[in-house]
Amino acid sequence: MTRISAPDHTPNRLGIVGATGWLGQGLGLNLLQKGLWRASELVILNRSGQMAGYADHPGVILARDMDEVQALCETIVLSVRPEDFPLPGFAPGNRLLISFMAAVPMARLAELAPLARIVRAMPNGGATSGTSYTPWLAGALDAGDV
């Protein structure tokens, strides 16, 4: 586990909020295990503050809070329960947000994050094995987002 004390923004860093839940962990661990993402470019946040499941991937950054995720990452995956949203400190600016949250429509995300580029993705249980069929819907994206 790595902690960063001062903001060190890197465009390639991916933040996963809810990174130890089944969808967030499915994404994070599959990206790492398949070599699609470097551990040093993955920032995770969860309620417990634990690295459950990520111990075999030194360099993964465990964020303290949403402010730290936003300071470190250009792209943020929201994989939390709808009742836990919005999170304290949620102010993503113009970052790319990918929401896995059930029952939180894009309109609500756009209301809370008017500058963000928003993608609503709906992975299923196959996410834990890297075999999820994941339909998605996007608002306005930049060419670099795709």
Q: Each predicted region: which residue ranges?
A:
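Short helix-loop capping/hinge motifs at secondary-structure junctions, enriched
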Residues: 141-145
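Short, acidic, metal-binding catalytic loop of nucleotide-sugar glycosyltransferases
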Residues: 35
